[in-house]
Amino acid sequence: MTRFIFITGGVVSSLGKGLASAALGALLQARGFKVRLRKLDPYLNVDPGTMSPYQHGEVYVTDDGAETDLDLGHYERFTGVPTRQSDNITTGRIYSNVIAKERRGDYLGATVQVIPHITDAIKEFVQADLTDEDFCLVEVGGTVGDIESLPFLEAIRQLGNELGPDRALFTHVTLLPYIPAAGELKTKPTQHSVKELLSVGIQPQILLCRADRPIPDNERRKIALFCNIKQEAVIAALDVDTIYQVPISYHEQGFDTQVLKFFGMPVGGEPDLSRWQEIVSRVRHPEGEVTIAVVGKYTSLLDAYKSLGEALTHGGIANNVKVKLDWIDAEIFETDGAIHRLEGVHGILVPGGFGERGTEGKIKAAQFARERGIPYFGICFGMQMAVIEATRHLAGLENAGSSEFGHPDPAVVGLMTEWSRGNQLEKRAAGGDLGGTMRLGSYDCHLLPGTKVRDIYGADFIQERHRHRYEVNINFRDKLEAVGLTFSGLSPDGVLPEIVELPTHPWYIGVQFHPELKSKPFEPHPLFTSFIRAAIEQSRLV
């Protein structure tokens, strides 16, 4: 019997509902329970795949090829449970599914309405594809009071009644702002937020109150009184110096204990949080520091690279060093002399991206790393830029480029017009839809014996997650290998280049996939662990 925990948010956005969900999932796991985490997103986009990174942040890709919210990355990193297409839904997808059913006549001529048809579809999603999970944690995106969230709130209200108190718990995340002039935390925003939630028929049983300092007992009593909950269920969600402290902090505040007590389940002994304590200790007490320059396109919004930043941190944890990230807009390197900003860094990483802006700056960064012997890690677009740089400056084809930016001669990177989804071969026509028309999800890759990546992975075959429309043209393999670049990872049929490396360089690797999506604090991705190790060696040379 799966129990459902619904997590909503109020007052303002970005209070940490996703981290709270992930942390609670980790705490329940530490007590021996099996969990699944889900996210309801209230925007009208079918998925975030075509949304601007400045609007949405990172698009997190699952093994089964779903383009989802970045909170699913937190879920995977904290619990280790792989997320799926069935763990993220948007208003756009719900409406699309309902309208498709109406067109097919599934509703037998009924008037299709938000209640019951949209809410029924949401409830069906929440409960679908569950097997033996003890708990399903469902985060509702947005803020209570937003018009977009109303169908989701109504759906979980109905579910709460249908499941009953022995299977449904409502947790609400709010803000307790500190007003310096008054010298105290203010509870009124929380009171009004709960009142707004009550107006749609939901009484929260647990409150997570974001605050930058401990909550005095008198304020807890006040919140409990006005919000109609037990005082011990007013949980302080305190600011911490590392997100890996969050599960420990929530346990100290009694979050997991209150959940079990609500469901009438035995609390038992203390959960084993030793591995979290070890991670926090490594983050707080590193033995050294390395600086990694991240040369990207969306560096003004770091949420666009959320998993990347975490994966680099994981590489630092594995090597017991602090990783200092220098986020650099690639466009600055298109001006004379700016490339010297990279002098003194211990590693250069060019992440994924789309579009022409900043392209030449990324190519210059790859060239700088290659010529100066600085560890270079190119991910997706970053691999393509490394290949273009090598084609221009090693193979002598000065006009080499990507067909993503026009009609270069030669186009060493080209559009994938055909690819396999399941057992069907698909082709994207010019002017067709962009949404979902990429190579998405987990694919096999064969690693060549004797290569650096073969040593790093310690395996002949790997599986990694992809999100791209363009690929390096395999027809340039011989020409590039003749000047020193090795195509060290290929698709099983040998057609698609997945990894390139420069054997004569201390650490120069480009990958077409996104390894950051599979890195976890307790299982750092081997490429990031190796990259940071190479950066440590570089730091001794600078």
Swiss-Prot record:
Region (Amidoligase domain): 1-265
The organism of origin for this protein: Rhodospirillum centenum (strain ATCC 51521 / SW)
Assembly notes: Homotetramer.
PROSITE patterns: GATASE_TYPE_1
PANTHER family reported in the protein's UniProt record: CTP SYNTHASE, CTP SYNTHASE-RELATED
Pathway assigned in UniProt: Pyrimidine metabolism; CTP biosynthesis via de novo pathway; CTP from UDP: step 2/2
One GO biological process term: pyrimidine nucleobase biosynthetic process
Binding site for Mg(2+): 71, 139
Family assignment from sequence similarity: Belongs to the CTP synthase family.
Domain of life of the native organism: Bacteria
Positions contributing to L-glutamine binding: 54, 353, 381-384, 404, 469
Catalytic machinery residues: 380, 514, 516
Additional observations: CTPSs have evolved a hybrid strategy for distinguishing between UTP and CTP. The overlapping regions of the product feedback inhibitory and substrate sites recognize a common feature in both compounds, the triphosphate moiety. To differentiate isosteric substrate and product pyrimidine rings, an additional pocket far from the expected kinase/ligase catalytic site, specifically recognizes the cytosine and ribose portions of the product inhibitor.
Activity regulation summary: Allosterically activated by GTP, when glutamine is the substrate; GTP has no effect on the reaction when ammonia is the substrate. The allosteric effector GTP functions by stabilizing the protein conformation that binds the tetrahedral intermediate(s) formed during glutamine hydrolysis. Inhibited by the product CTP, via allosteric rather than competitive inhibition.
The protein, known as: CTP synthase
GO CC annotation, single: cytosol
Residue span(s) of domain Glutamine amidotransferase type-1: 291-541
Amino-acid positions noted as binding ATP in the UniProt annotation, renumbered to this chain: 14-19, 71
Residues at which CTP binds: 13, 146-148, 186-191, 222
GO MF annotations, alphabetized: ATP binding; CTP synthase activity; glutaminase activity; identical protein binding; metal ion binding
SUPFAM superfamilies per the UniProt record, alphabetical: Class I glutamine amidotransferase-like, P-loop containing nucleoside triphosphate hydrolases
